[in-house]
Amino acid sequence: MIAPADLHYSRDHEWVRLQGDIATIGITDHAQEELGDVVFVELPDLGDIDKGSPIGAVESGRGDSDIYAPIAGEIIEINTDLVVDPAKINIDPYDTGWIFKMRVSNPDQVNDLMDAASYSGLVS
């Protein structure tokens, strides 16, 4: 399982890459390994979202898994490439497999998330 050190992680297996007040969010390598081959991604709608709210889902041969907002803010972009090729989540969950981008309401929210070492300990 890969957990890049520059990201923040939720207990629901989402990752957050914060650059200024913009966060890119996806599901972790561990999550995609547990799900198996991703066949469909329900992408979130643009707009404001609260921390912890369900915003979409990932479907695989092993079942469905909800995606939750690990932080609050405004969803400003979705990865529409996943509609055509949801397997990007399996191939590269931290780059081409990102799910959405948001303008965070408070960048300090990431301090409530785990670092890579803590997340690796959670899933080991």
Functional labels for PLM-detected ranges:
Residues 60, 80:
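Short, conserved catalytic or interaction motifs in soluble domains
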Residues 1-57, 64, 87, 91-124:
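Acidic, low-complexity mobile loops and tails
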